[in-house]
């Protein structure tokens, strides 16, 4: 059975689709614009708390935390435009950093490869990555109706238990950077470690293993 562990970062005491493609002026890449999407559908004081085995409960808890903090959910046609603006800002902020920004429906995916993020077998954020996360945090704070899913991944070099723990520590390091210095509301975050179970390249080569050692951040609109 694939190992899956989810860690929730929560607040203490606070409680149809159309698309077109355009050229991103900052990256020169073709991107899909989803402004029409959705038109039909009308503290942590320095630590992450606990383990969740029921991710649906964790999702509802996160929504409750945002509502308790006075952050309202997005609705209908506002979602596509909101995510379009956020995508443009992130693409500009992350240009030339090695971090990619891709669109998946109404979600944004930030893929952060190992040459940007962590040294081999380490979960301490490298200085270059720290600066990248600082820029991401600044934009996230301008878009408070965005949920943040952080997933750590490892290659297959170690045993399963080691890789699972390493992926969790890496994801937690990113979350702590965003909520600490970055001051992103902790209740917006959900943190996961996937170990070696979701490779995106072959683990048979050094280059492939380097690609698989990564952190992914998925940004999702907070819907009602």
Task: Identify the function of each model-found stretch.
Residues 1-8:
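Bacterial N-terminal signal peptides that target proteins for export
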Residues 43-47, 65, 85, 89, ...:
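Extracytoplasmic/secreted proteins, especially bacterial periplasmic and envelope-associated proteins
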Residues 83-115:
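Amphipathic, membrane-active segments
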Residues 151-224:
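Periplasmic OmpA-like peptidoglycan-binding domain that tethers envelope proteins to the cell wall
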Residues 17-20:
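N-terminal Sec signal peptide cleavage junction
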Residues 76-79, 117-125, 160-163:
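Second-shell loop/turn segments in exported
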Residues 93, 117-151, 175, 180, ...:
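Periplasmic peptidoglycan-binding/anchoring modules of Gram-negative envelope and division proteins
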Residues 23-89:
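Short, low-complexity, glycine-enriched hydrophobic/amphipathic alpha-helices that associate
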């Amino acid at each position: 059975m694939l190992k899956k562990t989810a860690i929730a970062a929560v607040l203490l005491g606070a409680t149809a689709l159309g698309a077109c493609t355009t050229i991103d002026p900052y990256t020169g890449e073709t991107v899909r614009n989803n402004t029409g999407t959705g038109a039909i559908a009308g503290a942590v004081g320095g630590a992450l708390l606990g383990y969740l085995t029921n991710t649906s409960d964790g999702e509802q808890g996160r929504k409750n935390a945002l509502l308790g903090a006075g952050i309202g959910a997005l609705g209908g046609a506002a979602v596509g435009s909101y995510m379009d603006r956020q995508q443009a800002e992130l693409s500009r902020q992350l240009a030339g950093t090695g971090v990619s920004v891709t669109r998946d429906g109404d979600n944004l995916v930030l893929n952060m490869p190992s040459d940007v993020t962590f040294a081999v077998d380490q979960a301490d954020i490298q200085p270059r990555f720290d600066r990248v996360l600082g820029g991401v945090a600044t934009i996230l704070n301008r878009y408070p109706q965005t949920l943040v899913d952080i997933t750590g991944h490892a290659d297959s070099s170690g045993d399963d238990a080691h890789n699972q723990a390493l992926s969790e520590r890496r994801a937690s390091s990113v979350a702590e950077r965003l909520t600490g210095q970055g001051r992103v509301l902790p209740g917006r975050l959900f943190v996961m470690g996937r170990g070696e179970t979701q490779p995106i390249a072959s683990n048979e080569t050094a280059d492939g293993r380097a690609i698989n050692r990564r952190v992914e951040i998925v940004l999702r609109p907070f819907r009602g």
